[in-house]
Amino acid sequence: MPGQNYRTISEFILSGFSAFPQQLLPVLFLLYLLMFLFTLLGNLLIMATVWIERRLHTPMYLFLCALSISEILFTVAITPRMLADLLFTHRSITFVACAIQMFFSFMFGFTHSFLLMVMGYDHYVTICHPLHYNMLMSPRGCAHLVAWTWAGGSVMGMMVTMMVFHLTFCGSNVIHHFLCHVLSLLKLACGSKTSSVIMGVMLVCVTALIGCLFLIILSFVFIVAAILRIPSAEGRHKTFSTCVSHLTVVVMHYSFASLIYLKPKGLHSMYSDALMATTYTVFTPFLSPIIFSLRNKELKNAINKNFCRRFCPLSS
């Protein structure tokens, strides 16, 4: 309203876990801590295996390493703060720290989506154009693709963060979430620009994510068409099995994201919001290295060769 005085907010209060029973918080802390450590260990194990095993020095595993790095950084940007809030009652976060957390969560989230899209393209070239693979997926070209995914994630993250934090925040400084979640933060904004910024943020996010999903689906349409032309059932199964881990992670990534951003308005409470948000911020990065290492026979054998047999001789 014209002439209304807005107080300057220098910090926010994260109240995402305030609705949980106090006796449940230590259990959640231990669970999320173990998942956080396993996420770091699993992704570092994948990266170390690819680094050591020379036959894994291919575009597919370069993209997988880039994905592991983005998952590690995404997890580090969110989970330590969440673990601290589970232990301590003082859950404030400064205005600047909130903006930084939002930027990194969006940056690595967008980068993750872009990398999944590039990995889909890699599978498409491998199966549909095997004779031209070395030309289309040259080391220099793959390095450029990885660089563009990170640059794109950085630009998109900066764009969304600047749009949100150029708004005026008034009234309550309590964010009903365990992190600086964009939708929860926008509810605290006021002024004439708020509605247009909300539309802008949604447009940027939906355009980027749906665009990536569309290109992934398009890649798999061509992949399935090529697989169906393989005469033997064994050949079809072997070819499709190379894509299963990537397809599983894509489905998981977009399914959990939909739980957060596309859930019906009627299903809304701090308790349910926090639980659903952890599926994307904690559970997805936790499952990704498991899926890639278990569903990828070549990677699983390399891990067993370089680590399991070396450090666990009894298991061999």
From Swiss-Prot:
It is a multi-pass membrane protein. The chain crosses the membrane at residues 26-46, 55-75, 100-120, 140-160, 198-218, 239-259, 273-293. Residues 1-25, 76-99, 161-197, 260-272 are extracellular. One of its GO terms (cellular component) is plasma membrane. GO terms for molecular function: G protein-coupled receptor activity; olfactory receptor activity. It holds the Pfam family 7tm_4. Disulfide bonds join 98-190. Keywords: Cell membrane, Disulfide bond, G-protein coupled receptor, Membrane, Olfaction, Receptor, Sensory transduction, Transducer, Transmembrane, Transmembrane helix. It is found in: Cell membrane. Odorant receptor. This is Olfactory receptor 10H3. It comes from Homo sapiens.
